[in-house]
Amino acid sequence: MKFRPYHNDIWMREGTQFRPALEGETMEIFNYLVEFMRTLVTYAFNLTEMVGFPSYGMAIIILTVFIKAILAPLTVKQIKSMKAMQELQPRMKELQDKYKNDPARMQAEMAAMYKELGVNPLAGCLPLLVQMPFLIAIFYALQGYPYNPAFEHFLWLPSLGEADPYYILPVLSALSTWVMSKQTGMGASGAAAQQQKIMTIFMPLFIGYISLNFPSGLVIYWIVSNVFQFVQQHFIYKGLEANK
């Protein structure tokens, strides 16, 4: 079989094998990661077959929960760091106002405050950077996954490889993103609160809009991921409040 475009040329077909269309040596490791994610989708589907309920939709849900559970320690670290920085916002604002004409002194005072309280302002970035390759890889993996036509339907969806014709998933993706944004912004103050307010409006609209054309399987991944993280953050926040 000749190569042919498959879902926006992200993947190409050769016989029964699929390979990424991303080129360049720098992308080789990422391509392997995408291939690995696609293999996990297949394994998850095989698992649903073993229990007598073959479903790619359930396979995506299982894989999403698995990935989020594996990345949970990094997510917990990121959330704790983010909450710590939110709680420091009032003190940071005081220092900014007090030393607004002396940037060097302001930075020194902030560094001393971080050291005193054991807070690293960059601690929340590293976990996110580690997670991003996996999240992007599953995005590409689901974007062009070669579903078996006999099992690519799920619930009201005729095909997980196509956009939701009834627009239910885009609404759910926007709603779940809005709930996540509201939860994440709890406790923010000052400029951070204003930025979070803007994101709470913009992100759900943006995610809902792009979900109109994304494959349903990919949108299901996004929704389940949001629901998992909402529950995860709820218990993390609850634990942090109990330890105060």
Question: Which ranges hold each PLM region?
Answer:
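Low-complexity, intrinsically disordered or signal/transmembrane-proximal segments
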Residues: Y6-H7, Q17
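Helix-loop-helix
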Residues: F18-K244
